[in-house]
Design a protein with these regions (language model features):
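Hydrophobic beta-strand positions that form the internal "hydrophobic ladder"
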Residues: 165, 213-214, 255-258, 301-305, ...
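Residue-level detector of Asp-centered blade-edge/turn motifs that repeat once per structural unit
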Residues: 159-161, 208-209, 253-254, 299-300, ...
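Amphipathic beta-strand/beta-sheet edge segments enriched in Tyr/Trp
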Residues: 22-25, 82-149
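Short beta-strand->alpha-helix linker/helix-N-cap micro-motif
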Residues: 26-88, 101-105
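Short loop/turn segments that connect beta-strands within beta-propeller blades
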Residues: 122, 185-189, 230-234, 276-280, ...
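A flexible loop/linker signature enriched in serine peptidases of the S9 family
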Residues: 158, 170-180, 197-199, 217-225, ...
């Protein structure tokens, strides 16, 4: 059985008014790398289709990243039918391929074994070779794992292809919309709903191992509360015993804590709390008359970034995980929301509202 390791960042913009969404993409500055992805060969015709499907998913993944251009298989001079011998690198140089992905597939009784090799065509050497064994129904996941390996060995950065997306799906007539918690693979495959739409769900976030989801929900149709949903069991549980509204949750990097905001009905403003999921003990991180919300842990778990109106407008702040050493990091005009740290910790993504427009 293949184990699941996936990471995901989701930025969700919520507004009370539905407006047309316009997304402007600027041109990239990196020239995509030509790469040849051959069909996985098999001595058993029953697995040829699966092998081709795996290769197609790998090609699609790499192309969508914007860093690779998979070459047309019609241009291939050599047809790889063995992994025991080195490819004829000159044949791949002729068609301008800088890297080559080749592999084979075999199996029986509902099980498959997939081997692949990644070659550097110009250096004429193998960069990586791996073998995966799993059930036949997991062939698509194997393709994503191979894609991640190819991506990492060429770029030096971890891939994102073996990941899932959690989001709020809105369906139904205009006057009776249903908002359901849903997940799918990063390439839109394997979509399914997790909740039935009988109650409102918002701001879902994955745990580090992607087996649990924390989100805000109106399960009781009263005050919104933070919940955790277990994907394997389908069970959900409320997070913490708070007398007021809890919202904007995120997991810590180790998955053992949740940072969220709490609005005390006796005070009215929102403060940030960290709840230990093992001990169920919560700790208040901010303490002032301002609204402090949308906290996110740094990758090492030592700091948090959040937005606050303590300066008069919504701006971004960083503090130690205990709330000390608060520092404002946004200075330009506009209001700032939903900050989240990059996996490397060198950047922070956020939503900005200025002049009636939203920007990411």
């Amino acid at each position: 059985m293949i184990r699941f390791f996936s990471y995901f960042f989701l930025i969700l913009i919520l507004s009370l008014k539905v407006i047309a969404l316009e997304v402007t993409l600027t041109q990239g500055t990196v020239k995509p790398t030509p790469i040849a992805v051959t069909d996985l060969f098999s001595e058993n015709s029953n697995f040829e289709k699966i092998g081709k499907n795996i290769s197609n998913v790998i090609s699609d993944n790499l192309e969508r990243s914007g860093l690779f251009i998979p070459l047309d298989e019609k241009a291939f001079i050599q047809s790889n039918k063995s992994l025991s011998q080195q490819p004829r690198f000159e044949d791949w140089k002729v068609i301008k391929a800088q890297h080559l992905v080749a592999g084979k597939i075999f199996g029986s009784n509902g099980k498959i074994s997939v081997e692949f090799r990644l070659y550097d065509v110009f250096q004429q050497k193998q960069l990586v070779g791996k073998k995966y064994e799993t059930s036949e129904k997991n062939w698509r996941r194997v393709a994503h794992i191979i894609s991640d390996s190819v991506f990492k060995n060429i770029t030096g950065e971890g891939g994102y292809f073996d990941t899932r997306i959690v989001y709020v799906a809105e369906t139904g007539p205009k006057d009776n919309k249903q908002k359901r918690l849903a997940i799918m693979d990063q390439d839109q495959a394997n979509h399914r709903f997790l909740t039935d739409g009988s109650y409102l769900v918002l701001t879902p976030r994955f745990s580090p191992n992607s087996q649990k989801i924390t989100y805000m929900s109106y399960v009781n149709r009263n005050s919104p509360r933070v919940y955790i949903f277990d994907i394997e069991t389908g069970k959900q549980e409320i997070v913490g015993e708070f007398p007021g509204m809890t919202f904007a949750p995120r997991f810590s990097p180790d998955g053992n804590k949740i940072v969220m905001s709490f609005t005390d009905p006796d005070i009215g403003n929102s403060e940030i709390y960290i709840l230990d999921l093992k001990t169920r003990i919560s700790k208040r991180i901010t303490d002032n008359s301002a609204i402090d919300v949308s906290a996110s842990f740094s990758p090492d778990g030592k700091k948090i970034v959040f937005n606050s109106d303590r300066s008069g407008r919504r701006h971004l702040y960083i503090s130690d995980v205990d709330g000390k050493n608060v520092k404002r990091i946004s200075r330009e005009a506009g209001s700032y929301y939903t900050p989240v740290w990059s996996p490397r910790g060198d950047m922070i993504a956020f939503t900005k509202q200025e002049g009636g427009q939203f920007y990411i």
